[in-house]
A protein has these predicted regions:
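Terminal alpha-helical anchor/extension segments at protein ends
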Residues: 1-174
Length: 174
């Protein structure tokens, strides 16, 4: 029954799924679920019925952090593989242009990276005042949106993880 309820979420969302329940119930769910590949983590702990969302979040959060750490590592490794295949763009100027063309498979960006700029087609002009007319206050956010709307994936990594790539990198589809 729970697996049926999960169908709607899994078919419409791309986010992770975490299973929370006693060891026995979590194991039974995993054995019966059609969605095992979407399960990002299991928290083997029971909670009283009617527990608050805040309490559930506190219990599940360590598993979410573990999953995010694994995703960051996987994204960095995927970028390294793309270097060998000559399918990697780095730095906001190159990434901006290729993302607009729909070539992004995986965008990896440092979590606090933001940049105000004026967009002129494929080119970006950095600005001092993010409130000036015609300025995009955060072109990094625009790149993220562009990659996602064109079916690409996005991974946010810790600051300093992409220093050699100017804080942003794009694995190309072709």
């Amino acid at each position: 029954e729970v697996d049926l309820g999960l169908d709607e979420y899994v078919n419409g969302a791309t986010g992770p799924v975490f299973v929370l329940g006693t060891r026995e119930r979590a194991a039974a769910f995993l054995a019966a679920s059609r969605h095992r590949r979407r399960i990002a983590g299991v928290v083997a702990r029971g909670l009283p019925a009617g527990e608050s969302v805040a309490q559930v979040a506190r219990v599940v959060w360590p598993a979410v952090e573990d999953w995010m750490g694994r995703r960051q590592e996987e994204a960095i490794l995927e970028l390294e593989d793309a270097v060998g295949a000559r399918r990697l763009a780095a730095g906001i100027d190159e990434v901006w242009s290729l993302a607009q063309d729909g070539r992004g498979d995986l965008l990896v960006v440092e979590e606090s990276y933001a940049l105000a700029a004026r967009a002129d087609g494929d080119r970006l002009e950095r600005v001092v005042d993010p409130r000036a007319p015609g300025v995009v206050d955060d072109v990094v956010d625009e790149v993220i949106e562009s990659v996602m709307t064109r079916g690409g994936r996005v991974a946010i990594v810790a600051d300093g993880s992409l220093e050699e790539r100017d804080r942003i990198a794009l694995k190309l589809r072709y």
